[in-house]
Amino acid sequence: MLGKARELANYQDEPEQLPTGSFGKNAFLRLGFERRPERTVLATLHRRAPLIVQQALYWDEGMPTLPCVSIISNAGGILQGDRYAIEIDLEPDTQAHVTTQSATRIQEMDANFATQTQTITLGANSYLEYIPHPIIPHKHSRFVQQTEVTIHPTATLIYSEVLMAGRKYYGTGELFHYDLFSSKFHAAHTDGTSLFTEKFIVEPARGNVSRLGAMGSFHVFGNLILLTPKTHADRLFETIDPVFDMDEGIAWGASRLPNDAGLLFKVLGMESAPVRAAIRKIWEAARQEVTSASLPENFLWA
């Protein structure tokens, strides 16, 4: 059970407001994509507020048959005692793009914690872009996320995560004032073969996050996990050169995942825009490699 994670041992007290996981704090979302003759459709949609999805739209000019889904929250952010669960299921030969409406704000907490579990299943020859907006942890917030991926060897997943240092421009600034951010990602093939696990725990009060070997002088962390067949991963890896440019405030690099699972791309930056732009470059290259489709111009408001 995610709430029993070791790093949450000090945050088991109940909020004085609504009880943990009660109505309005126990969000659930299930998205099921199926193939139709002309395109992929969002065939299954189950939702429980605060997580909301209205419908799939087809606005991607590079892939006109790609259903694009925005996850919306009507809660104004993730609050103490919230328990979120998201399930995304792609049938064979389907394609989908999933994002969030805006940045995910993890609100300030004085009791308990918040969790989110994500379960993603990709069938044969399926393709998923899961590109949420950044996560902004507020002062004293505690958040644990666990992502479980089951993927067919012929499928592709582009999964990104951007973590801000906090509300950098709020008042005198909140940089690494949150209590806990924990994120675990595990991937396995559909036959049960485990591919890899990555987990990082950030507890700024227990260690200097700005030290060498961690964030250094950077404020934004970007993580892109590309699960794809080895032939695609090999070609993409050869095109990615590491960058470390303090004048521009950006650094990135790529490495291969264990068991020929794909690639891992990490970015550090001072602001979110350059980090997201770097992730977008890899996303664009991966889409071109796997689907031969282009990525449309970014929206002016994105």
Curated annotation (Swiss-Prot):
Pfam families noted in UniProt: UreD
Transmembrane segments: none
The keyword Phosphoprotein is annotated on this UniProt entry: no
This protein's record includes keyword Transferase: no
GO molecular function: nickel cation binding
Domain of life of the organism encoding this protein: Bacteria
Subcellular location: Cytoplasm
Keywords attached to this entry: Chaperone, Cytoplasm, Nickel insertion
GO cellular component, one term: cytoplasm
PANTHER family reported for this sequence: UREASE ACCESSORY PROTEIN D (PTHR33643:SF1)
Subunit structure: UreD, UreF and UreG form a complex that acts as a GTP-hydrolysis-dependent molecular chaperone, activating the urease apoprotein by helping to assemble the nickel containing metallocenter of UreC. The UreE protein probably delivers the nickel.
Function: Required for maturation of urease via the functional incorporation of the urease nickel metallocenter.
Family per similarity comment: Belongs to the UreD family.
Protein name: Urease accessory protein UreD 2
Lineage: Bacteria, Pseudomonadati, Pseudomonadota, Alphaproteobacteria, Hyphomicrobiales
